[in-house]
């Protein structure tokens, strides 16, 4: 993931056992929609726990906090998010700003 965004979004997902593959497909569709329809969306990753395969963490980079907030207010965003959440027992979301950047 490029660290070009000035704002970051994350999701902590606990997917119902047996629904993991469908969740990955729905999340991918949600993020493809986001990248096509939400100005300022930069890049996203979804990682999965190796110890508990029903736990996922998503991280998205945004050009600005305003772009992220505009996306959150889009009616279709709530619909697409709902498709993912329907497969989860727990979901939390967070907003972040860049604190440090390292890399090669």
Where are these regions (language model features)?
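Short, well-ordered beta-strand segments in beta-rich or mixed alpha/beta enzyme
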Residues: 6-14, 43-72
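Short flexible/disordered coil segments
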Residues: 11, 72-74, 99-104
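Non-catalytic surface loops within mature trypsin-like serine protease
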Residues: 15-17, 64, 97-100
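An amphipathic, aromatic/His-enriched active-site/gating alpha helix that lines ligand/cofactor pockets
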Residues: 29-42, 61-95
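Glycine-rich beta-strand-turn "strand-cap" elements at beta-sheet edges
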Residues: 1-6, 43-54, 80-104
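Short, surface-exposed ligand-recognition loops at beta-strand->loop->(often short) alpha-helix junctions
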Residues: 14-25
